[in-house]
Amino acid sequence: MEAENGEVAALVEKITGLHAAISKLPALSPSPQVDALFTELVAACVPSSPVDVTKLGPEAQEMRQDLIRLCSAAEGLLEAHYSDMLTALDSPLDHLGRFPYFDNYVNLSKLEHDLLAGHVAAPARVAFIGSGPLPFSSLFLATYHLPDTRFDNYDRCSVANGRAMKLVGAADEGVRSRMAFHTAEVTDLTAELGAYDVVFLAALVGMTSKEKADAIAHLGKHMADGAVLVREALHGARAFLYPVVELDDVGRGGFQVLAVHHPAGDEVFNSFIVARKVKMSA
């Protein structure tokens, strides 16, 4: 226990130092300095760790909340930068590997498909909420794993959707004809949610645990009975980068948890939860 406490203390000290350095940056747009600091931060958070972020002291909790905000802003700028860079190239889909976390998305889409296959037989319609300017998850599922499925991508930012549409426009007709983009907040979606067999909720939808719980409850109110929710989540030290999703919140939202996947190595960064919408009793 003493060794475990020492490991947690050392991790918190390192992340606190990185937070201080990131906070002093003049901007969060991609640059050698920004890239180096966030690469170091991700490397510190990837290894398995005994840390439970819910048990951190008030000062560390305040640091973590601000770090989550900084990571969200930096991730949005990073994705916008690479979306613009890729679409400026001839045959942009041939150069997706330039994105620093490309391999993570390739591996993640395979894992998501493999887990879904045990619970959903060939979904006809899938929604991605929080798809962003680089809709890699839906693009890779549409291209490699679900060739007959239609994908609706939702993001609250119309500029992000414009970038995504431009990128997906370079895909084969058989892929791009099955990919649609809509500008909306998750809470704006009501009746349309009932049409989907699967709904993916991205890690950046909801910047606090309460916002995430509220989003899940909203989906539980409007998704069809038997439909499946896939929620990106974080575990261990990775929870310094995104808010934690509590399984109790998934259950209270009207879902039965079917599977929880936590990555064993560094091939995939995100954990995710697979849950089925249950019929609400009268």
From Swiss-Prot:
Provide the leader sequence positions: none
Q: Which domain of life is it from?
A: Eukaryota
Biological process according to GO: nicotianamine biosynthetic process
PROSITE patterns, from UniProt?
NAS
Q: Which InterPro entries match?
A: Nicotian_synth, SAM-dependent_MTases_sf
MF terms (GO), sorted A to Z = nicotianamine synthase activity
Protein family membership: Belongs to the nicotianamine synthase (NAS)-like family.
> Please, what other remarks does the record include?
Homologous to nicotianamine synthase, but without enzymatic activity.
Identify this protein by name: Nicotianamine synthase-like 5 protein
